[in-house]
Amino acid sequence: MEPATEIEGNSNPGSSRPRMFGSTVGSGCLSWQWVTQRLSRARTYWIVTTRSAGQTHSRPVWGVWLDGTLYFGTGSLAAQNLTARPAITAHLESGSEVVILEGVAELVSDRAVVERMVSLYNEKYHWNLDPKQLPGPFYAVRPKKAFGWSFEESEVTPESTAFGNATRWRFR
């Protein structure tokens, strides 16, 4: 499958409040721009795939957020898992500026997209990858749902609204 470079409705997806068990949720939502800024500047992304027997497999990957899509490369067990079960969760490393994407990973087969990803990888990670000799395939994650929240860890108390700006976005 070839990924689209734009996700319909991705520039301004609908937002709502998620259920946050055991915490107080305030009234303000985060903007989608807040999410895209963090995804764009992240160096490492964590992905969670599912093995054939149903166990989850979590690992860090390097990637690029571009045009509403998370692109990453992997030649590991994650690639095998995605071949059989393309459902994926991806998130950033921070526990205080949380961004979580849920969606489907698609193998990137369009040569022009692969070459663009290699160019962006080389720039971002100071590599010298050759698009004809990649260690593994590239995937594109199309979010179906996203979550985000932020807080200052030093300000969290049992009475605080630690997840006061928790927001959920849904995509068409």
Residue ranges: model-predicted function:
Residues 1-29, 97-172:
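Charged, gly/pro-rich active-site loop segments
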Residues 75-76, 111:
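Alpha-helix N-cap/helix-start capping motif
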Residues 19-46:
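Short, basic/aromatic recognition patches
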Residues 36-39, 83, 117-122:
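A generic alpha-helix structural signal
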Residues 34-36, 48, 64-67, 129, ...:
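Intrinsic disorder/low-complexity segments enriched in polar/charged and small flexible residues
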Residues 42-75, 82, 86-93, 100-102:
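Short beta-strand segments
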Residues 36-37, 62, 80, 91, ...:
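Short secondary-structure boundary/capping segments
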